[in-house]
Amino acid sequence: MTVANSRIPTQTHSGLTEMANAQSKRLTISLLVPCYNEETSLESSIISCLNQTRPFDQLVFVDDASKDRTPEILAKFANRITAVRTPQNTGNKSSAQEYGLTFVTGDILVTTDGDTLLHPRFVEEIEKDFADSEVTAVAGYVNSLPYNWLTLCRAFYYIVGQNLHKVAQNYLNYIFVMPGCASAFRTEIFRTVCTFDHDTITEDLDFTYKLHRNDHKIIYNQNAITYTQDPTTLHGYMHQMRRWYSGGWQNLVKHFSFVVVSHPIRAIELSLIYIEGLAFSSLLLITPFLNLYISLYIMIGYMVVVLIFAAWAAWMGRRPAILLAPIPYLFLIYINAYLFMETFILEIVIRRKTLIWFKPQRVEMSQTLI
């Protein structure tokens, strides 16, 4: 029987040489995960990191002198991961990362958290991006694990922010922030450019600014997906938002003068984010005291916009429950506005820098969620 196009291609010597060279140039990828008292979520996180279509070449987990079962859980995977322990609790995520960085050997460094699950193709996606030698860092896509109304609102926020704002930032070649639980860097550049200054409470934003200051290329990959735990209590939510806003103001002060001189257009873009935040927060908090009717009209108009985006986000994220997010989300924007103004006064007006890290309560995670 004759089969059309049945010729079997033969590999020439030059072809074999090219394949060998390609294999020799294969980038090695390391994972760095700081963890402190993560007994409820750590095992699921480790399993997700191990179950990759393209395995990590090295997995480094830094136990920041935990007092729970974290060391015991890490010991269960001792033959598959590198588990190290700080001499004493640093009380700071970036300090634990800095300690763990000394053990990292890969060409590419991936950072995530002990309360985060990686999509099985996360490493595969990251590897594709770094095939471009000009790419220095990759920002991944963050999903909020479902738990209650707070995480539902956060899921809504993530979908809109990452499918609209971050896509636009990627188009303009100015990613605003690398997510701490879904980022990857060329290791040597991370060591020499990013560094750990420990002078802001949001090190991921500090790293991003430093890369921009040195004209390094950051890209956004929506297919490099992670699933993270967000605060499940209002108390935890407020602490996280206070940290994010405080860290934002700290990094604005730290890097703004340099950005103004070297990248004036980007300085304008950066300023607009904070100016818009101040204007919107002031509008929400002050208008009710000036004219209740105007405040009501503003909220009705805003509610219509939120409903439209919620419908789109529910479809985009394949999460129908997001249709229920607008009502509690409107409650949260007042809390956000208050915290934004509070941190502005503390960090910019009074200049009382906050560097205290608050660790939210964790809940158990399931691999079936991804």
Residues covered by each model-derived region:
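N-proximal low-complexity "stem/linker" segments adjacent to membrane-targeting elements
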Residues: M1-S48
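Cell-envelope/extracellular polymer assembly enzymes that use nucleotide-activated donors
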Residues: L27-S30, Q58, D206
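Acidic helix N-cap motif at the loop->helix transition within catalytic regions
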Residues: L42-S44, D68-K76, Q97, R121
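Short, acidic, metal-binding catalytic loop of nucleotide-sugar glycosyltransferases
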Residues: I47-F56
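Short beta-strand/loop segment that forms part of the nucleotide-sugar
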Residues: D57-A65, V84-T86
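Long helical/loop segments within the catalytic core of UDP-sugar-dependent glycosyltransferases
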Residues: R85, N92-A96, G106, P120-C194, ...
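Short aromatic/hydrophobic "clamp" motif used to bind/position activated sugar donors
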Residues: L109
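Membrane-embedded multi-pass helical conduit in multi-pass membrane proteins
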Residues: L272-K353
